[in-house]
Structure formats: structure tokens, C-alpha cells
Amino acid sequence: MLTFPSLAWFQELGRLMNENEAAFRRFGYADVTWALEVQPSSPAHTALLFRFVFEEYSCSEVLELEPGTDADVDFTLQASYDTWAEMIQNIQANNGPDLEHSLNRLTLMDHPIYIAASDFLSRDLFARFGQTFQLFFNGATNIDTDFAP
């Protein structure tokens, strides 16, 4: 069992992406460097920051960075622990997200997930590769997960 959120959990998601190249080929290649920020849901917890590199049909890098570090990414998906945990639990319960828990829905109004980017073209990469990101997170259905903020 892996704990969400943790480096090991996200590395497993990357490994699953790499094992399922054929599924990702359906959406076309994705060359993008991005980050995911887990914002604390209470003052007792600290933020977590993870960096991902997608090259063609694979995840070539997953790193945990210190919060506040310049992640050198195209964009960062920012949301609270509660938002991320609810999305992952929904994906696991339904073998994929219901309409209210898809990345498209959760980012549509910049709430509850905000897409932080330095410019519009970088932010647009999320939309361009949106199906790839959703399929990446759908890999959570194959991870036995313990949720701990």
C-alpha cells in the first residue's frame, strides 16, 4: 500500500503510465514538464510539490521538490489535499472519474484546481494534453492507496 500524497505514490503512477504506452498513444505524444502542488488543508500540515516530465508517451521523471522551489515547469496544478484526495478516491471508486471529478471539470473555473503558469501558452499545454493527464491520474485505479494529509 502506498500513501497519497508521496513521492512513491506518484512514481507508481509514472510507472503505470510507462507500462501502458499503447493507451497513451491514442491521444498523441505529450512533451511537457509540469508540477502538482498539494496545499495543506489545515495549518498543521505543509504543502508538497511534485515535478513530472512527460516525453512522448511516457513519464520520464517524477521528483519531489521543496515547496516554494522554482520547479522550472510549464504549469503547476494547485489544489488542497482534500481536493486531490477526493478526486483520486472518486477515480478509484468508479474506475475513472465521474463528471464532477474529471480534471476538465475541476480546473474549468480555476477552482478547486488552479493552473498556475507564467504565460498563456504554457497554461494552454494543460488543455492541449488534457486527455493524457486524465489517463495518467486514472492509473490510480491500480494503486492500493492509504490517504494521509
Predicted segments with their positions:
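Feature captures hydrophobic
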Residues: M1-P149
